[in-house]
A protein has these predicted regions:
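SDR active-site strand-loop-helix element
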Residues: 11, 35, 76-79, 117-123, ...
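NAD(P)-dependent short-chain dehydrogenase/reductase
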Residues: 131, 154-208, 213-218, 222, ...
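Active-site helix of classical SDR
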Residues: 144, 148-151
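C-terminal substrate-binding subdomain of Rossmann-fold SDR/epimerase-dehydratase oxidoreductases
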Residues: 197, 201-309
Length: 309
């Protein structure tokens, strides 16, 4: 598959992946319809570009999108999802609503004339796995968030078949970059180090796969064009190193010599100790080759947080 696409709807455009995807598609010359929650405080982060059109529409109102985007679009990237952190991940009714909203968005995509739906899944669909995460790795999610993502991916795949659309489901691992959720590890650690604090940390022995947001965005764009319909693609760098090394890199970029509180916090219950994507299917179908070393992406992310305290 190598589909010619020129326009896209992006839900959830103000997070790390969404912002990077907006920039990537604009760089390719696409028309981008960035769907934001009305009154979103983060909408000001969106790139200022004549081909970017901000659409105010709550996630619960997907049926309104065809009327708000009368010109239609070629693709939809559905990144929006509620209750992604903390106790909200096990709010089962809220996660069930996320499933419904995802189904409503693929139906809206069909009415917009979209030929492909790219949905943002999660490594949480797998649960705890020792070894590489592959498209066919059995899924045993351990929280409502992962369960709902798995269900949404399966249900929208069936909807896509009924609607005559291509369907791509991307199980995103750990992406970092400008605009990331401030409660995620990389931004929370950056902010603490910029304040001169000594953050309390686990021992940092987890083997972890981090991917810079710009590389994730390129992968999503290429999957929309070339991805196999019905395909599931784990998305990471394909390389895992001890979490401690990432932390030390951030420290060395911000405040070399600053003490770090390794071992001051216990591991969480059901802590994932090995997170790593097998990107061979992604590479085979799209030519995927992440280009940003962690130190380089981290430096760009730190600069963004210094400009956006």
């Amino acid at each position: 598959m190598n589909e010619a696409l020129q326009s896209a709807v992006i839900t959830g455009p103000t997070g790390a992946v969404g912002l990077a995807l907006c920039r990537e598609l604009l760089h390719r010359g696409w028309q981008v319809y960035a769907v934001c929650r009305p009154g979103s405080a983060r909408a000001g982060r969106l790139p200022q570009h004549p081909n970017l059109h901000k659409i105010d529409c709550d996630m619960s109102q997907a049926a309104m999108l065809p009327g708000l985007i009368p010109s239609g679009a070629d693709a939809m990237f559905h990144l929006a999802w509620g209750h992604t952190m903390g106790e909200g991940r096990n709010d089962m009714l809220a996660q069930n609503e996320n499933i419904r909203y995802t189904i409503e968005h693929i139906r809206a995509a069909a009415k917009l004339g979209c030929r492909v739906f790219v949905g943002a899944g999660s490594q949480a669909e797998y649960g705890r796995v020792e070894g590489l995460l592959q498209p066919g790795t059995p899924c045993f999610p351990e929280n409502g968030y992962g369960m709902a993502k798995l269900c949404a991916g399966q249900m929208t795949r069936v909807e896509a078949e009924k609607l005559g659309m291509r369907h791509i489901w991307v199980r995103i691992l750990s992406v970092y970059g400008p605009g990331d959720n401030e409660n995620a590890m990389v931004p929370s650690l950056i902010r603490a180090l910029l304040r001169g604090e000594c953050p309390a940390l686990t021992a940092g022995e987890q083997l972890w796969d981090y991917l810079y947001s710009a590389d994730a965005a390129k992968a999503l764009a290429e999957l929309a064009i070339k991805g196999r319909s019905g395909g599931v693609y784990p998305l990471g760098s394909g390389r895992a190193v001890p979490l401690k090394e990432y932390v030390e890199t951030l420290r060395d970029l911000i405040c070399p010599g600053q003490p770090l509180g390794f071992g001051q916090r216990p591991y969480a219950p059901r802590q994932v100790m090995h997170l790593q994507a097998d990107v061979s299917a992604l590479r085979q179908d799209t030519g995927y080759a992440p280009a940003t070393p962690f130190a380089e992406g981290a430096a760009q992310t730190i600069a963004w947080y210094q400009e956006n305290p």
